Amino acid sequence: MKDNKIIIFDTTLRDGEQALGSSLGINQKLQIALALENLGVDVIEAGFPVSSQGDFKAVQKIASKVKNSTICALSRALDKDIDMAYEALKVAKHFRIHTFIATSTLHMQDKLKKDFDEILSMAKRAIIRARSYTDDVEFSCEDAGRTPIDNLCFMVENAIKAGAKTINIPDTVGYTLPSEFANIIKILFNKVPNIDKAIISVHCHNDLGMATGNSLSAILQGARQIECTINGLGERAGNCALEEVVMAIKTRKDYLKGFYTDIKCENIFKTSKLVSAITNESIPSHKAIVGSNAFSHSSGIHQDGVLKNRQTYEIISPSAIGIHENRMLMTARSGRAMIKTCLENLGYDENTYNLDDVYERFLRLADKKGQVYDYDLEALMFLSYESEEENEFVLEKLSVISGNIPTACVCMRIKEELKTEACTGNGPVEAVFNCIARITNLKPALKAYSINAKSSGVDAQGQVDVDLEFKGRKFHGKGLSTDVIEASAQAFVSAYNAIYRSLKVEERKMA
């Protein structure tokens, strides 16, 4: 194929949604679809209309709103499925019907109870029916990775003859390795006489962690469409991750010569975060490209290298996917160069402090606290702050009443004085936040709030992380407890103490 554009077919709303504990609402699906359109996705598989009335309506609404991406709906090789897909899609500016049937011996015999000739006949009939509605028909050979190669070649040849313009080769259970999968695509191009009449697509699952590798190996052998999902969302171990294949193609142009996509890479990160928020599926911190640690550096050796030249330890610029903040973490593994750079960024001349002394105290704080923030470093310099035990605000007691009007009562120690306040809120967490704000007489804005389980069982501990914004600066707080409300209160108090120390630093600077 002369054109080396790789078509990006996103199935977050269909295959990705199957991984969720509950279905997404119509407006949630539309929000994701519009984000995918803005990202530059070529084909959006919006759902499986015959599966439920809700899915039908979601596909129909997406089809009516999205204008720049082709909207696709899935159907089995059955007339009612294909007809329903068309009814949902017909309002779209551009639409595709995607029909499929299993072709592996295992699936044909044990699941469908049919022989290969029957499956072949069903496939051709389905494609012809779909073609009566649109020229844009995709056919998938389900479990192609475990289908005998001669059967697969014959099926693909006949599917193209029947009118399919895109032939999808799925590794449905993530069984193949990149060299195997590449060989399947290579054989298809060598043995199927009419293969130039269709676009070959691949749909790889990640059961053995090979989804991205398999997809990339396939395009080297002639495939020109990759089916994928945002954040690799999907059944079992997930699907090929859109962000991974797109950035691999963009980053490794030396190896993947001439290949490109129309994805607006600068929108990748915000799309990833949006999908994570809507689906309530957190992104693992170590997830390639979009994980919180993907561009973070805590090792002193790595930090020193990045400070001298980012390419020493970063093969992708964070800004390429829309991240514009520095993720150099200050921990006990950080070196003097990192601390010096942080102080320079805060406006301190190296002649105004003793780096060895500051670094020694920094290490003591980092050993106790874990991650150290820039405001902690300032407090360490001006206030000799080296321990969380030196906090101005201490949480003493907490009680919460849930119901129609959630109410919290918080008692805090400020120096030697105990102060108690009771407040209401939209929920118990907000009520606690309001109490702490009133007691401290500080009014920061809550910018981020997250809960993560740190253990399992009925006595599981939850960690709450919060980001508060005060006078244009963000402050982080962390709390850990078997009670999520108590953990929230601890996190708020931790952040409030950081704010208080920053105010004391400003006083010292002015003195």
Swiss-Prot record:
Primary role: Catalyzes the condensation of the acetyl group of acetyl-CoA with 3-methyl-2-oxobutanoate (2-ketoisovalerate) to form 3-carboxy-3-hydroxy-4-methylpentanoate (2-isopropylmalate).
UniProt keyword list: Amino-acid biosynthesis, Branched-chain amino acid biosynthesis, Cytoplasm, Leucine biosynthesis, Manganese, Metal-binding, Transferase
Annotated protein name in UniProt: 2-isopropylmalate synthase
Catalytic activity, reaction form: 3-methyl-2-oxobutanoate + acetyl-CoA + H2O = (2S)-2-isopropylmalate + CoA + H(+)
A Gene Ontology molecular function term of the record: acetyl-CoA C-acetyltransferase activity
Keyword Calcium appears in the UniProt entry: no
Names of the cofactor(s): Mn(2+)
Primary subcellular site in the record, as a coarse category: cytoplasm
Binding residue positions for Mn(2+): 15, 203, 205, 239
PANTHER family: 2-ISOPROPYLMALATE SYNTHASE 1, CHLOROPLASTIC-RELATED (PTHR10277:SF9), HOMOCITRATE SYNTHASE-RELATED (PTHR10277)
Species whose genome carries this gene: Campylobacter jejuni subsp. jejuni serotype O:2 (strain ATCC 700819 / NCTC 11168)
The keyword Magnesium is annotated on this UniProt entry: no
